[in-house]
Amino acid sequence: MLSRYAPADYDISEYFNILCPRDDWPPFLDKYLKLPVLQRLAGVGLLCGTDWTPLYKNRFYYSRLDHSKGVALIVWHFTHDKAQTIAGLLHDISTPVFSHVSDFRKGDALTQTATEEPTARIIRGDAELGRLLAEDGLTASQVEDYHIYPIADNEIPQLSADRLEYMFPSGMALDGSWTMEEICRCYNDLTILKNEEGRDELGFRSLEVAELYCEHFCMIGHILQLNENKLTLQLLGQIMNMAEKAGLLSESDFMTLSEREVIERLDDYTKHDSHTKLDRHGELDRHAELVSASITSSEQRFRNKFGMTTSNDVECHCEAEPKQSTSRDILSRYYHTFRTMTKIEHTNEALPENEYFCVNLKVKQRYINPLVVAQNSAVVSTDSTNVKSVRLSDISEKARSIIEDFKSYSDTPYGCVKLL
């Protein structure tokens, strides 16, 4: 599925220019992007650890900093409101390495919001950020919760800046399903509409473009429903838990190290314990160059400031917690499997625990049912509060079928990978 589309080169600067043309770029944004508390996110991938396993063939590395910047540009483009834009920029400030993998390891695969808990504390505790906010006449309370701004964030299946930005680069990187031309067409068709609750929401001017976007979005969301994705995130989450228990990594490390640094530490820890030669290791290292994010002096000042709590209540059919005498062997086995796996098995039952790592999980469904301007209405500007809008599924049989197919889809009960 991930090789359906031919490889293509993507220019992320061109993508950002679609989101917000340079002549409309928010003049205050760059100074915030330079903050250590945000620069840390350059070392955190958007795609939840899939950059580090050959099971995926990600076309390029896209960081949480890139995503945060993209969300801010979208919010600014549609609102020109400084507080909302900065709130969008800061919304992922508490994201640990490997992004939503930390939700999986904390038992939150279904909602994937556990990592948001420290956001307000981090924002209020950063002196440099506080100084910039004061210069711009803003307070922490105005930017610490982007959920209060419906253009920035709302609930599925509505469309928001966060959801919009997340799925554009996900589709480009995971399977190449978005072209720049399609992104430009969809994005330039958007406007602000009023939803059923009378709240602002991004929506489409034309039915045809709304259908195109819905189809692409649900196709990418389908990738995230597959057992391949569930297993990858859960396996990496178990590796993180074992590394923390072994004293190799700490909760603070997950908030301060880059993904590359975590991988290098795991490489060093497990390299003498490999039961098989990592034939793909060289290829993975070359791929990892795309993921590298050097820790600058400004990022260094951010280290050791924040920690997180954990709990492990995710339903996982995998090996029982290893005894101390074998924990290193199990960690090495899991890690080498993660770094070399190229396929998994889809099964109705869990396979033997001593040979396989298996998952049986329900995860967050990412789909969209956007607003679209009613066919008897007209809209010519980005402010369409008086224009009648409807949900796409109410007027499009095609979209209704796509959405229902997505919601009813279920992979096999178990996804399993043979352990090395």
Where is each model-derived feature located?
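Histidine-centered, transition-metal-coordinating active-site segments
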Residues: 1-83, 97, 101-279, 287, ...
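Short alpha-helical catalytic segment bearing the HExxH-like zincin motif
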Residues: 84-92
